[in-house]
């Protein structure tokens, strides 16, 4: 993550797998915002999401392009592409192994690189959204001060974009 930290690449409200950040810091910042809004007499609507199988759904092709966009090029990007490509998987049931099939998406969980690769992949999640988005890896809190029906529609549009 030193490249991401050195060049200040990662989304500032991403609290996962980062120095001095945690699930607790995500929650503290969120709660602080909501309490401030309550003190100011403002309504805050909140949506809390967890994207199922998020690590498994990472497109290798898109991840490589995103890393290149963030300045990871040349040998390192080639090495990471090699790390992800050529993987296969099978299922074993009662001692019988299925046919091995290629794995074209996902980052290897339990690997040292998996979390960093995932953070690069999800880094642009809040682009084009009007709500505040706070992340702990893929655990997402989206919220917005609601002053009118238009604000509620804005939050709904952001939810629709996040669901894509």
Regions found by a protein language model. Give the residues of each.
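Conserved pre-catalytic core of RNA-dependent polymerases
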Residues: 1-108
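Active-site palm subdomain of RNA-directed nucleic acid polymerases
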Residues: 1-14, 115-144
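Short, surface-exposed helix-loop/turn micro-motifs enriched in polar/charged residues
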Residues: 9, 43-46, 132-133, 151-154
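Flexible, glycine- and charge-enriched loops at secondary-structure boundaries
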Residues: 20-23, 115, 152-155
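Hydrophobic alpha-helical membrane-association signature
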Residues: 30, 117-121, 155-162
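Hydrophobic alpha-helical packing residues
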Residues: 34, 51, 87, 125, ...
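Catalytic palm subdomain of template-directed nucleic-acid polymerases
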Residues: 53-70, 141-164
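Short, conserved phosphate/pyrophosphate- and ester-handling motifs at nucleotide-, phospho-/glycolipid
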Residues: 110, 114
């Amino acid at each position: 993550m030193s490249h991401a930290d050195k060049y200040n690449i990662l989304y500032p409200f991403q609290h996962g797998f980062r120095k001095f950040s945690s699930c607790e810091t995500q929650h503290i910042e969120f709660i602080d915002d909501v309490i401030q809004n309550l003190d100011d007499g403002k309504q805050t609507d909140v949506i809390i999401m967890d994207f199922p199988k998020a690590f498994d759904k990472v497109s290798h092709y898109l991840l490589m392009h995103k890393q290149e966009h963030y300045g990871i090029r040349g040998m390192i990007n080639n090495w990471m592409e090699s790390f992800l490509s050529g993987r296969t998987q099978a299922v074993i049931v009662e001692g019988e192994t299925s046919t091995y099939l290629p794995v074209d998406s996902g980052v290897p969980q339990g690997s040292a690189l998996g979390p960093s690769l995932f953070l690069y992949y999800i880094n642009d999640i809040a682009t084009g959204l009007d709500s505040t988005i706070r992340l702990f890896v893929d655990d997402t809190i989206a919220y917005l001060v609601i002053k009118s029906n238009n604000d509620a529609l804005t939050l709904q549009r952001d939810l629709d974009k996040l669901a894509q």
